[in-house]
Amino acid sequence: MIRTMLQGKLHRVKVTQADLHYEGSCAIDQDFLDASGILENEAIDIWNVTNGKRFSTYAIAAERGSRIISVNGAAAHCAEVGDIVIIASFVTMSDEEARTWRPKVAYFEGDNEMKRTAKAIPVQVA
């Protein structure tokens, strides 16, 4: 059996740019890519917390330390500057590998300040 698992996630980053006329993609600060394990040119899903839209594109690197999250091309219709989004990538693996897999998650606040990283998502409690 093959399973699709969360590979990496940027939780609650703020969109800093939205460029309808750029070729496409989502530019992400290289530090953020490193923290989440997301690679340049990797397929990503973006879930807009602000407006509820969900869309797919691919990641490109933005300048390290810039805190840039730039949604580009047609995807710019799905996000505006200031929107809070979650960016995720996924990986496929065997059922056996999935049993011990841990994603790389980076948590953000304010103006894209990385507050912490984790190898698991906390258990939701009542």
Swiss-Prot record:
Cofactor: binding comment: Binds 1 pyruvoyl group covalently per subunit.
What this chain does, per the entry, is described as: Catalyzes the pyruvoyl-dependent decarboxylation of aspartate to produce beta-alanine.
Q: What cofactor is needed? A: pyruvate
Superkingdom of the source species: Bacteria
- Carrying Pyruvic acid (Ser), the residues are S25
Q: Which modifications occur after translation, per UniProt?
A: Is synthesized initially as an inactive proenzyme, which is activated by self-cleavage at a specific serine bond to produce a beta-subunit with a hydroxyl group at its C-terminus and an alpha-subunit with a pyruvoyl group at its N-terminus.
Q: Which CDD domains match?
A: Asp_decarbox
Pathway terms, separated by semicolons: Cofactor biosynthesis; (R)-pantothenate biosynthesis; beta-alanine from L-aspartate: step 1/1
One matching Pfam family is Asp_decarbox
Active-site feature positions: S25, Y58
Reactions that this protein is recorded to catalyse:
L-aspartate + H(+) = beta-alanine + CO2
Similarity annotation: Belongs to the PanD family.
Q: Does the keyword Cytoplasm apply?
A: yes
Sorted alphabetically, the keyword list is: Autocatalytic cleavage, Cytoplasm, Decarboxylase, Lyase, Pantothenate biosynthesis, Pyruvate, Schiff base, Zymogen
Name a single GO biological process: pantothenate biosynthetic process
User: What compartments host this protein?
Assistant: Cytoplasm
Gene3D superfamilies linked: 2.40.40.20
- What is a GO molecular function of this protein? aspartate 1-decarboxylase activity
Q: Which PANTHER family match?
A: ASPARTATE 1-DECARBOXYLASE
Q: Which residues bind substrate?
A: T57, G73, A74, A75
- A GO cellular component entry from the record: cytosol
Any idea what this protein is called? Aspartate 1-decarboxylase
> InterPro entries from the xrefs?
Asp_de-COase-like_dom_sf, Asp_decarbox
According to the UniProt entry, what is the EC number of this protein? 4.1.1.11
What binding partners and quaternary form does the record give? Heterooctamer of four alpha and four beta subunits. Interacts with PanM.
